[in-house]
Amino acid sequence: MNLSNHFLVAMPDMEDAFFSQSVVYICKHDEDGALGIAINKPSPITMDMIFSATGKNIPMRMQHDSVMMGGPVQVERGYVVHTPIGNWQSSIGVSDNIALTSSRDVIENISREGAVDKALISIGYSSWGKGQLERELADNAWLTVPADEHILFDIPYEHRYAAAFAKLGIDPLALFSGAGHA
């Protein structure tokens, strides 16, 4: 099972302080573990802080976007999920059209016409060790659904959890993650 380019959707009863009601975009998943970016947890960092650090202006299309808290790992670093993939210093391709980049050059070029069409900027990332995500899935902590660029880039962050459940065709209020016993 490879969940790259999928959303992890937290079960409604997840009690983890960070991951409760989260949607995580899985950027890499292999036998060694998984790496993803939470796409619906705003950070205290502003777009102005990000772009002023590079000496660039915030692109008009991103004026009202929030910087996400991508996860509890390496919160001092920035990460950008974006289209198109492009040619950046430190990127991993997630799909044919989406990449995760951790190098500053993507931010420095984000306002240049045609360099980056859509972007989600985060600080930190989410990570699972070997077999950890598979155990959490077996324990019914998460639901999975193929990623949707509209949810990832176009829907306001506060509506992404509901949108992911809608894509699954599930009412989150009807779910119970505990195993049933007869």
Swiss-Prot record:
InterPro entries: AlgH-like. SUPFAM superfamilies: VC0467-like. It comes from the Bacteria. Pfam families: DUF179. GO terms for cellular component: cytosol. Disulfide bonds: none annotated. HAMAP family: UPF0301. PANTHER family: UNCHARACTERIZED PROTEIN YQGE, UPF0301 PROTEIN YQGE. Belongs to the UPF0301 (AlgH) family. This is UPF0301 protein NMC1274. It comes from Neisseria meningitidis serogroup C / serotype 2a (strain ATCC 700532 / DSM 15464 / FAM18).
